[in-house]
């Protein structure tokens, strides 16, 4: 849980820190030069002065008492990351094992859910590719094992059949269908869309693998080459049906999805990947117009002023791979925060919502909180405390200024996945849950 996984944005983070380091070095150099000048002045040979008559010095009087000024208090060092309880080590290991144990060893596809394994999710594959290096770093698998699994996955993705046909294909124009058959790797069913955001989550894992496996071994070289091929073939402008925004996806039976990615949500990574494409990029106006759709999402919720999106995963997913501390676009510069701080505020707002508990669910409180996309009990309407309440099976549950839904289902991933943003409230919540 303590790893910080970074792909895109690393250079910006380094630049920010680099500027700080230059400042410190400049200040240190100035102090050193000043000290050197004082030493030179003290050691410089003085010109002889004319002789003066010897005068008997007066008898010394009482020595005045020197009162040393009290030193100014030094500013406190910022606290380091808290020591994580053993529970988190167990969660980290179990999370890794889920991706390692459930993935199809033949093609590298990871199921959308477990223990039922009806289909693979390409987003899950992206998270699997990210998890394997964590297994290496912790000694849970060898580098050779992880390289083998990663190569299997990337070879399948690079060679998967693409085309406009409704059946027998894994994707089209470089994009992948959201759900694939676990065995064949082809589109699972006619209701499955060609997904821009799930392709984005897949690509984040692909590019993370490319960044991690930097060895000269031919197999690691192949990983980097395959990752490059997979990223380069995605034709981002093809999904700009209403430029410059990017559509959510496409169906071979009925064409492009009528909705574009707008408002603050997990699609941040879609625009980042599309802007950075070396072969089929979108123009910079795509980001500008996308951030212009933020306005309905900025405001105060549960005492926190931030860019709101109800389901908490929207404040987490892009941050898995990009460290946004100190990185601000024009919109966030205007607001005076960065996206990392925004996610921190969103985390506190989720907790405050559970403490207030406006729907009077049982057990909600300061350490029982977190609404995000997850499975639920069932799809039904039932009486609860004298009211008719809607309950759902799978749903993007959330608390915020928009996209809010609460049927009393707390998903532990909402809290645990925010460990980087607010460990001081996430640790007790995780222990309670």
Name the predicted role of every residue range:
Residues 73-433:
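Ser/Thr/Asn(+Pro)-rich, low-complexity disordered segments
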Residues 49-81:
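Post-signal peptide N-terminal segment of mature Sec-exported envelope proteins
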Residues 3-12, 55:
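Ser/Thr/Pro/Gly-rich low-complexity, intrinsically disordered segments
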Residues 44-46:
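Bacterial signal peptide processing site
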Residues 1-2, 15-17, 49-50, 61-62:
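Compositionally biased, low-complexity intrinsically disordered regions
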Residues 40-42:
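C-terminal motif of bacterial Sec signal peptides marking the signal peptidase cleavage site
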Residues 11-32:
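Bacterial N-terminal signal peptides that target proteins for export
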């Amino acid at each position: 849980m303590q790893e910080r996984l970074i792909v895109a944005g690393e250079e910006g983070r380094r630049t920010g820190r680099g500027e700080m380091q230059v400042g410190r070095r400049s200040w240190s150099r100035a102090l050193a030069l000043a000290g050197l000048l004082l030493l030179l002045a003290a050691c410089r040979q003085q010109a002889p002065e004319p002789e003066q008559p010897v005068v008997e010095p007066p008898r010394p009087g009482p020595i005045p008492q020197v009162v040393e000024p009290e030193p100014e208090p030094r500013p406190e060092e910022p606290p380091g990351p808290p020591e994580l309880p053993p529970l988190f080590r167990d969660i980290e290991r179990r999370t890794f094992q889920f991706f390692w144990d459930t993935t199809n060893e033949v093609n590298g596809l990871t199921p959308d859910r477990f223990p039922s394994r009806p289909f693979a999710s390409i987003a899950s594959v992206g998270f699997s590719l990210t998890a394997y290096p964590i297994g290496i770093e912790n000694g849970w698998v060898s580098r050779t094992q992880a390289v083998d699994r990663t190569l299997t996955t990337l070879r399948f993705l690079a060679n998967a059949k693409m085309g406009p046909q409704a059946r027998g294909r894994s994707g089209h124009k470089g994009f992948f269908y959201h759900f694939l058959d676990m065995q064949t790797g082809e589109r699972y069913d006619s209701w499955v869309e060609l997904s821009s955001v799930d392709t984005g989550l897949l690509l984040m894992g692909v590019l993370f693998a490319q960044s991690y496996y930097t060895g000269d071994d031919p197999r690691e070289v192949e990983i980097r080459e395959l990752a490059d091929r997979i990223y380069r073939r995605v034709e981002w402008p093809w999904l700009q049906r209403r430029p410059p925004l990017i559509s959510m996806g496409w169906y071979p039976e009925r064409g492009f999805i009528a909705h574009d990615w707008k408002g603050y949500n997990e699609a941040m990574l879609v625009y980042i990947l599309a802007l950075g494409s070396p072969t089929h990029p979108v123009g910079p106006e795509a980001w500008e117009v996308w951030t212009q759709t933020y306005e309905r999402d900025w405001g105060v919720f549960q005492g926190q002023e931030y860019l709101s999106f109800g389901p908490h995963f929207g404040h987490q997913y892009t941050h898995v791979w990009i460290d946004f501390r100190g990185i601000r676009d024009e919109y966030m510069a205007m607001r005076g925060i960065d996206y990392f701080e925004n996610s921190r505020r969103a985390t506190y707002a989720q907790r405050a919502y559970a403490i207030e508990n406006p729907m009077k669910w049982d057990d909600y409180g300061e350490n029982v909180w977190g609404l995000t996309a997850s499975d639920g009990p069932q799809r039904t309407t039932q009486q609860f405390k004298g009211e008719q309440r809607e309950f759902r099976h799978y749903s993007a549950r959330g608390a915020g200024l928009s996209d809010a839904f609460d049927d009393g289902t707390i998903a532990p991933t909402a809290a645990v996945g925010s460990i980087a943003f607010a460990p001081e409230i996430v640790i007790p919540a995780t222990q309670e849950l």
